[in-house]
Amino acid sequence: MFMKSKAAGSEFDGAVAKDNVNTRLKIAQFMSADPNATADVPQLKLETPTAFKANGEVDTWGPLGSGTAFNDVVNVRAYSVKNSDQPRVMRYFLFSLVNIDKDGTWSDVRPAAGLYEQDPGYVTPGVDPNNKGQGQDSGLVSLDATGLEGDVYLQVVGLDFNYNRVAYLVPLKLNRTKAASEVVAPTNVRAIAYTLSTRIDYLYKTQDPVLDAPTSGTNLWVTTSWDAPVTLSGYRGFRVLRSTKAEGPYSQVAFAGEAQCAKPADAKATTRRCTVSDNTASLITDQDYFYKVVAAGTNEATSDVAPTHTLPIFQPKLLSPGKDVHDVDLTPNYTVKLNLFQTGATGAVMNLRVADFITGESYAYAAKRLTVRKELGETQILSNLQGTSNYYVFRDSYATDNDPKTNNDTVTYDAASDVLTVPHQFEVDYLGGNKVPLQANRRYSWYIDSGYAYRLADPSKPTTAANNYIAAYSVYSDPSDTVRVVPGGVKQGGAEVNDFTTRQ
């Protein structure tokens, strides 16, 4: 157990002992909700069913001991016990199966439910008599074997309402009872990297990132996916391998079973899509990675290589109107230093907003779906012009094509200064309409509501090239609770906001 000032407690209970294997663990620590409250970590009891009723419900429970053997599925529960003057109220329990390979690389997979959140207003009595029925119980949690066999580990993490954290690592024996058969290599493998602009940091409050500095940790992961046969009855599972070079060597970073594969699209489907993420702590940004997927049965079959390149943090900087400035024109230009192409990105997609400061609910202007990209040897800017299709509003070639129709006086990008300029309501001007100016002597807020940088699988080829999908995202902001602008991403807030006041 260790402590930082005003931080909650954190404790790891377990060990990894393998011949000639060095394993390093990074123990997370949260800032406490109340620095004056207890920093003692919660204590959990771990149990496994010893008997089931005829209807499948658990009849009796017994302690989960080191080396307990399971067949195909790991059935466990966790509940809190009293270890201080008050019963512990929990935020969540987390369960995962862990594999540690010969190189000491830790990889884990969680059940579909992921976190098992606890209701602070409701406690489920635990069975510990010293707890007097005031503990919190996860109930039965079943973890599929997901491609594992032999010596594995169960990780159980508990977080209480002062952000005190405890983690248990229990060695288990996992037996596979179903018959294996010959398997075929996974096909159509893709590896898509995700970087968040705001790191999910459990130990310290985040600082402004250094844009060209490699980062690692919980703001970075790679999602791998592949096609597998509809019928997986003879499969023991899949192993996901990673290397920094196409020729290897490769290390296992994730694993999957049928639980990680979607249902077939319809009755005529011959394949199903499987997905699992590489969340290992050794991932860093601005790095080439290569992935393979191995199917395991009575034989092993390995897929082709899928490349990706993890992007650094994408942090566009708002320039003008500046923060808290006055006397701004009623049809201003909004300028942004992109900090984009030097990161290795192919382009970026952004939604710019100008909000009424007083009501906070309406937009005075919304530039939707601006795409800035490098393609065919030039910088291009596209916009959906408030519709559904993208149109070119800027190309480097416009400056030299001697075509009066392409004289660009709308959105521009200056490569020397890396500055994007977006005139107020440029879409209206572009389409020959009349702009609606901002109101005089009024306060507004402007910001990039949602935006991300992206990199194609082969940046040297155009977007329309075969299989040239987006292989990496760096998410600046994706704040919606319901709709993601980044496929497969997570909610990401914290966009920079500049407030300004218009002229009289």
Curated annotation (Swiss-Prot):
Pro-peptide region(s): 1-212
Protein's UniProt name: Uncharacterized protein DR_A0282
Organism whose genome encodes this protein: Deinococcus radiodurans (strain ATCC 13939 / DSM 20539 / JCM 16871 / CCUG 27074 / LMG 4051 / NBRC 15346 / NCIMB 9279 / VKM B-1422 / R1)
